[in-house]
């Protein structure tokens, strides 16, 4: 997906929010993979990754998978130390009510994240005219420079909840945030601590399950329920206001997260490039009514 194609898309939804310091933002509506193209396993889950190819995946705000994401030993792998193009990735189908399961393994000192109900969001830097004065010895001139409008993608994590992926023993985020543990693995990043904290250490596989049903969200880590919360009501607003995404600290993030999933209350799954090596496997989802 190229920027010019987004600007031309007739399905784009535009909104202006005075609460976000007058910033105009756009939510791109792009082609999605049809679920009929996916394998359904014996438990009724759609397989989002088959361990062989990256069908259905692409970079956030891109029309391809960045080269640092690859397949290694049957797992979806991010090569944090390697050369090439990085960036977050998404699975190109939006889900509303679901049971989402996967396993992750993080490198020593590593950090990543699992996104759900994500939207591709961009802000428009308007066209403008600048007048500049140039001098070269006795010669001077006033030149008018026109700058075209520019579309800037905003970080995926300001549009949706994030389930943290972290080496709790070594990464400094494990001790940051308003409450100890609020940025540790499987927490609702910077909002709710995962209790009990039963993550396995770096280099070992951890199992995560995330359920969403009419805005009721639950995180499970290694088959244990660790947190639950309700989207789109006062509880959600209070969580946002007590986090780094508060209306005061980050108006655009607050506006987008307050209405995460958009008017249709659905969005993409995604994985974060935080610069560290990470692996994901057994990625599957069951659609629930």
Locate each region found by the language model.
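Carbohydrate-interacting regions of secretory-pathway proteins
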Residues: 21-289
């Amino acid at each position: 997906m190229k920027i010019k194609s987004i600007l031309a898309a007739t399905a784009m939804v535009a909104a202006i929010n005075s609460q976000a310091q007058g910033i105009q933002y756009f939510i791109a509506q792009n082609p999605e993979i049809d679920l009929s193209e996916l394998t359904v396993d014996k438990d009724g889950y759609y397989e989002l990754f088959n361990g062989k190819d990256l069908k259905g995946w692409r970079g956030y705000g891109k029309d391809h998978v960045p080269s640092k994401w690859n397949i290694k030993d049957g797992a979806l792998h991010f090569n944090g130390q390697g050369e090439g193009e990085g960036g977050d990735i998404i699975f190109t189908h939006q889900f509303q009510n679901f049971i989402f399961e996967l396993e992750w393994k993080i490198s020593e000192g590593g950090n990543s994240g699992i996104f759900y109900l994500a939207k591709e969001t961009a802000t428009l830097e308007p066209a403008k005219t600048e007048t500049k004065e140039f001098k070269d010895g006795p010669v001077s001139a006033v030149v008018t420079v026109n700058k075209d409008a520019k579309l800037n993608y905003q970080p995926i994590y300001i549009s949706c909840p994030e389930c943290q992926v972290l080496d709790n023993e070594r990464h400094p985020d494990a001790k940051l945030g308003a409450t100890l543990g609020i940025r540790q693995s499987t927490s609702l990043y910077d909002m709710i601590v995962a209790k009990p904290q039963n993550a396995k250490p770096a280099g070992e596989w951890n199992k995560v399950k995330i359920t969403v049903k009419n805005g009721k969200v639950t995180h499970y880590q290694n088959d244990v329920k660790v947190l639950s919360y309700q989207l789109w009501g006062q509880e959600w607003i209070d969580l946002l206001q007590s986090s780094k995404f508060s209306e005061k600290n980050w108006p655009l993030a607050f506006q987008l997260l307050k209405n995460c999933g958009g008017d249709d209350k659905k969005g993409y799954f995604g994985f974060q490039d935080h610069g560290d090596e990470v692996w994901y496997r057994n990625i599957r989802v069951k659609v629930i009514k």
